[in-house]
Amino acid sequence: MRNMTRWSALALVCVTVALGACDRSSPPGSTTATTPPASPPAAPSSGVRLYVSDETGGNVVVIDPEAASVVQRIAVGKRPRGIRLSRDGKELLVALSGSPIAGPGVDESKLPPADRAADGIGVVDIATHAVVRKFQSGQDPEVFDISPDGKTIYVSNEDAAEVSIVDVASGNVVQRISVGEEPEGVTVSPDGGTVYVTSEASSDVAVIDTKTQKVLARIKSGPRPRSVTFSKDGATAFVTSETAALVGVIDTAKHKIASTIQIPKTEGTATPPRPMGGALSPDGQQVFISLGRAGSVAVIDVASRKLVRTIEAVGARPWGIAVSADGSKLYTANGPSGDVSIVDLATGKVEKKIATGGSPWGVVVAVRK
């Protein structure tokens, strides 16, 4: 499906966060699209590519957004969720988990035992689309981020209420740090000095000092914080609060909530917004927040810290979200409907929906330069 031209460079535009009504779950009452089998590894051609983790299919789905088509499926392992490009753009990293999916109200004692051997961070070579390594990760890895120098990975371990620190050179966990209950979102500050970790059940954000590898502060957030997105200068961080329909604005110098942004329900709709994933525009002026069951995306102005518009009817429960390198397109992973939406940011309208099958969770944009 692709020729043997090698990508000379890639850029991570944005990534994030999650797909599921709660921690380890698919949304109640949702249907999961059938996942086609993975295709064999092939070298990618030039142009923009979307890499989408498919939690129920065990694949990373490769999409050509211009052609609006799936061009490959890379089999990576069980429950791929969090997904990022390496800092040098040569590899794709994806969190894999052997924990069974537990929907709301499910008695977890009746689920099959977790397959801890399946836990890890899978590494895919961008040039060949082959899985080349698997890092240790701690239990049930969900979301992770990479240090600016690319040498360290910070992983949320939901089952263990910990963050694992992974040395990229060895692929081993070198430290574990206790954080709040049900940690999910993990974001490294632009200067690499701190890591912000959201804890859903504790309703707080743990701030980890990367030098001491200790928690230096805990920021009380709104209920069920899901993700953190830093401003370009790192002075401000935006934390989503799922069940309060708000975004907290954190002063990172003080490690405190400075203000909150309430996301109103769309008039005439019964479904409240559920702030989930976040992505910063390339120029750093706006933050895009996926609103889950509301099927929309909130747009926040970084300078004024205000909601400036809401993009409606994006897709079924958008969560994972990313922005194109030129800032003209927005991409959302819509788990219940098994597709990815491409939004024209000039018009605020969905241009295309690309069927992925399975349950798309996170999305990464890679571009050839």
Residue ranges with predicted function:
Residues 1-11:
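Bacterial N-terminal signal peptides that target proteins for export
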Residues 4, 19, 23-24:
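C-terminal or otherwise distal, non-catalytic regulatory regions appended to signaling enzyme catalytic cores
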Residues 22-369:
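Predominantly soluble domains enriched in secretory-pathway, periplasmic, or organellar proteins
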